[in-house]
Amino acid sequence: MHRRRRLVNIFKIGSVLIVLAGLGWGLSWLSYRPFWNIATVDVHGTVSVAAPSVQVLAANDINGAYGWLISKSNQILYPRGKIAGDIEKNFPQVAAVQLAVSSDHVLTVNVTERQPAYRWCAAPDFAPNFPDAPTALATNQCYFMDNLGLIFMPVPGGNEVLVATSSMTTPTTGPQLFRFYGRVASTSVPVGASYTNKTDFAALAQLVFKMASQHLPSYALVSRPDGVDELFLNQGGAIIFDDGQDLTQVATDVAALQQSTTIFANGSKLEYVDVRLGNKAFYKLVDTATSTASQ
């Protein structure tokens, strides 16, 4: 009796395994049928990225099978997330990837590339003298950054000479892009790194725009290793503040100086304004020996 029951159980288990194996084989067979599979990969939207390289990467991701059974090139089951993730990982200048399969079995990869909004450059090995900052900050080690502060590609063809001009009223207009220096190690290729977190970068960019709206356009921000930031003005001189300082208050303090002094007037030779000391700002003019505290 027990033997018969055991044989029945073995038969049932065997039948289930045979059915499962049959289903697996059937699904595998169906997944490889041409009418279910991607035949070719097309890439659109690339500018600086080589489209053939993206095409090869996507084609490699749909090659093979899941668990040696289900085709990865199946139009329903192809690895969307992996393809998009691999493209963004291997090509930092890519901001977004959209995938779609057409009725003629073509996988279309639509790429959106990042747009240069700023430049990141390796910081000088010394603190630039404020009157000579454009010369001291000139460098060939510059990379494009997007509007979120991500460094995504080298500036092609070298860099133009850094010259502060009155036409640079905002970071993204005028003959040059606004430059950020420091924070990212320059000993290795910085592509893929961020200048700082998105919130802090947005605050820094907002300060640049705020200064421009107060008729104090700037061309570069240097973040020093000691935690001090210097915003270099087109008219000459710099605004000095601490990393992590309330940047809204920085703009307010500078605006107060504009109202109470003439240090920003045309013809003045400002060396720096230091707003690191709470409710007082210090400023120094070129060729003067000491700084002056605002009232």
Q: Model-predicted segments: where are they?
A:
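Glycine-rich Rossmann NAD(P)(H)-binding loop
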Residues: 45
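Charged, solvent-exposed interaction patches on well-folded alpha/beta domains
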Residues: 1-42, 51-52, 57, 65-90, ...
